[in-house]
């Protein structure tokens, strides 16, 4: 079954619709195919298929409910078709709550993708303009990591190398 209703910046409604679709179709894992938004949404959907309530109930910052999930998320497979966010390598999602105008991060140790299929050939069809946007995204993420107040030597080394590669 294919759920293809993810927005460029996913919102709670995307997540909840995707979770309902997953439940209706008896999904036992979730594949995120596309850019960072698609993969972030897949992680959030994987969280919500086996759990009740609203996605925002499980967000710890802002107006989130701060609840613990009762059930582990479904396994997630990430297949990026763009480069820039690196979301296939982490457990975190970025989802927008349109009611409160908040864009918050969610996830936990169980929302790391169990598999990432990273093939540069998937990125060949991306228009040059979007490839440039993704380069800036990678640069900003790396710079953010480097100047973060909770940084450490290993993170600094990786961030500096990423900045060097992108620059």
State the predicted function of each range.
Residues 2-12:
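Short beta->alpha junction loops
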Residues 6, 82, 121:
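Anionic group-transfer/hydrolysis microenvironments
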Residues 13-20, 24-118:
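Glycine/threonine-rich beta-strand-loop-alpha-helix active-site module
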Residues 92-167:
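Carboxylate- and glycine-rich phosphate/diphosphate-binding segment that chelates Mg2+/Mn2+
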């Amino acid at each position: 079954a294919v759920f293809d209703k993810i927005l460029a910046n996913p919102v709670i409604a995307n997540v909840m619709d995707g979770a309902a679709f997953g439940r209706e179709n008896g999904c036992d894992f979730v594949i995120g195919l596309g850019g960072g938004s698609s993969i972030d949404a897949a992680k959030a959907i994987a969280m919500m298929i086996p759990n009740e309530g609203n996605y925002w109930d499980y967000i710890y910052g802002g107006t989130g409910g701060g609840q613990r999930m009762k059930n582990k998320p479904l396994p997630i497979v990430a297949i990026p078709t763009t480069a820039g966010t690196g979301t296939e390598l982490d457990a975190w999602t970025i989802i927008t709550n349109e009611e409160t105008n908040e864009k918050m991060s969610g996830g936990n140790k169980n929302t790391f993708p169990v598999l990432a299929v990273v093939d540069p050939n998937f990125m060949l069809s991306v228009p040059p303009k979007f490839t440039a946007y993704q380069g800036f995204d990678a640069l900003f993420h790396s710079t953010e990591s480097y100047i973060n107040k909770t940084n450490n030597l290993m993170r600094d080394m990786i961030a500096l190398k990423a900045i060097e590669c992108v620059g």
